[in-house]
């Protein structure tokens, strides 16, 4: 079984998240994409984040009806900050060797990977699928990771990815870039502007019903 793990704040989830997930599912023929909202994002400690409950409900509504998409609240079950290394280890320990993990993240996040907890260990635990935008020129791993560490990953032409000493690969894959952001959606709601077609209707209705992001 091949599972993709897609973490994020999802405040709120939007069409960009969903489209990227669908394209990566198709590219790697994944059996499942698991959406994992961060409970306490370590890189956003100073920012106000909507309650986990509301973000969970919005994700559940957004993926409803897609049998390949599922939800996990694993990061809300742990106390303290939400670290990706702990989430990946949770799935590996729970399902042992019955799943192959593809950790999904954007190119901007990957370029900041050295700020993550136990990032070197994380890169050896599972496959990484780095989402790139049209026109993005891959600088290779040496332009992102320390040279000595990057040398452990050898480009595998057949897989079109960088294979590490653990056998897992780091892939760079171009996906459709929808210029949508959660922060823009929040700002639009606050200013009374339409968010139709930026997020699923079910999420839009939930935001309105619960007066999220609004000053009312």
UniProtKB/Swiss-Prot annotation:
One GO BP: NAD biosynthetic process
The keyword NAD is assigned to this record: yes
EC code: 2.7.7.18
Keyword Nucleotide-binding among record annotations: yes
Keywords of this entry: ATP-binding, NAD, Nucleotide-binding, Nucleotidyltransferase, Pyridine nucleotide biosynthesis, Transferase
Reactions catalysed, as given in the entry: nicotinate beta-D-ribonucleotide + ATP + H(+) = deamido-NAD(+) + diphosphate
Alphabetical list of Gene3D superfamilies matching this protein: HUPs
GO molecular function, one term: nicotinate-nucleotide adenylyltransferase activity
Record pathway: Cofactor biosynthesis; NAD(+) biosynthesis; deamido-NAD(+) from nicotinate D-ribonucleotide: step 1/1
Family: Belongs to the NadD family.
Role description: Catalyzes the reversible adenylation of nicotinate mononucleotide (NaMN) to nicotinic acid adenine dinucleotide (NaAD).
Protein name listed in UniProt: Probable nicotinate-nucleotide adenylyltransferase
Annotated source species: Syntrophus aciditrophicus (strain SB)
Organism placement in taxonomy: Bacteria, Pseudomonadati, Thermodesulfobacteriota, Syntrophia, Syntrophales
Gene this protein is translated from: nadD
